[in-house]
Structure formats: C-alpha cells, structure tokens
C-alpha cells in the first residue's frame, strides 16, 4: 500500500473511499473459525486503517480532505438485535471505532471522516435476496460524501444520509 501511495498517487487526493470488505464465515457461537475471523478482521478493520495511513500525504495536499469508510449497520452495537455473524460484526465494529478515533485525530487538520452503510446491496456478498441495486447505493453514498461538512466528521450514515445509531 505504501508503494502504491508513494509511486502512483503522487499528487493531491480530495476524497478517499475505503470500500474493500469480506463477510467471513457466518458461524454459530461455539463453531467460530478463528482463522477466518482473523482474516476478516485484517481485511475489514485493519485494511482501511492501512490505506488511510498510506494515503495521508496525498490527502493532506487535497482541498476537500474527505475520507469515507464503507462499513455496515451490522457493526452497530445499537442495531444488533439478531446476534451471530461474529467475524463480520466484530470487524465492522472495530472499523467503526477506528474511524471515530481517526476523525478526532484528523479534525484539527480539516478532515471530515465518516462511516457509510451502503444498504443491503445486490452483490455477491449481499446475496440473492438483497433489495438495493448497486448503482443506487453508490449514487446515494456519493451524494452523502458530496454534502459532508466538518460537523459530520466521526458520524455514521446510511446511503440515504440517515444517521445510523452506534
């Protein structure tokens, strides 16, 4: 990642969207696959932190200084009424906490750092019952990003701009 940031992204970066993620195995309590959980955590929680850290020089040169992290409502403590999905939920909750800390650390430099829930999107990960076409989710998240201001930093929104409880 540092090589990419150093050799490819050599100029200003106005907006960074961290959107990589995996669902991990959905195991019942007592059947958790800890190797899969570690992999899921590495991708979903540590990956965005690594990318953002590597991109900071370019972001600091940018005019907008916006960083959006695609997370999930499933990483919300307040919204967890179903249980299960330990790897995914824990990794997204960890990402959410990292972004909250990041927003505090970067706010003095004029950064706006947010979390975005894309909705239940029609992708391989969303599965056959997902209700939201990917282009609609993307359009919505881009509208949210475009409307960000400093008061939004550290907050969690869905693709329609509605704040998600933590």
From Swiss-Prot:
Keywords: Cell outer membrane, Fruiting body, Membrane, Secreted, Sporulation, Stress response
Stated name of the protein: C-signal
Keyword flag Membrane: yes
Notes on activation and inhibition: Synthesized as a precursor protein (p25), which is cleaved after secretion to generate the mature active C-signal (p17). The p25 precursor purified from M.xanthus cells does not display C-signal activity.
Species of the source: Myxococcus xanthus
Post-translational modification: The mature C-signal (p17) is derived from the precursor sequence (p25) by proteolytic cleavage. The subtilisin-like protease PopC is directly responsible for cleavage of p25 to p17. The cleavage site is probably located between amino acid residues 60 and 68 in p25.
MF GO annotations: oxidoreductase activity, acting on the CH-OH group of donors, NAD or NADP as acceptor
One Pfam short name: adh_short
Induction notes from the record: Expression increases throughout development, reaching its peak during sporulation. Transcription is inhibited by excess nutrients and stimulated by peptidoglycan components and the B signal. The csgA upstream region appears to process information concerning the levels of nutrients, peptidoglycan components and the B signal. In the absence of nutrients, a region extending 400 bp upstream from the start site is necessary for development and maximal expression. In the presence of low levels of nutrients, a region extending approximately 930 bp upstream is essential for the same tasks.
The encoding gene: csgA
Matches recorded under Gene3D superfamilies: NAD(P)-binding Rossmann-like Domain
Further comment: Overproduction of the CsgA protein has dramatic effects on the developmental program: the rippling stage is bypassed, aggregation occurs prematurely and results in the formation of many small fruiting bodies, sporulation occurs prematurely, C-signal-dependent gene expression is induced prematurely, and aggregation and sporulation are uncoupled. Reduced synthesis of the CsgA protein causes delayed aggregation, reduced sporulation and the formation of large fruiting bodies.
Disruption phenotype: Mutants fail to form proper multicellular aggregates, to differentiate from rod-shaped cells to environmentally resistant spores and to express development-specific genes.
GO-annotated biological processes: sporulation resulting in formation of a cellular spore
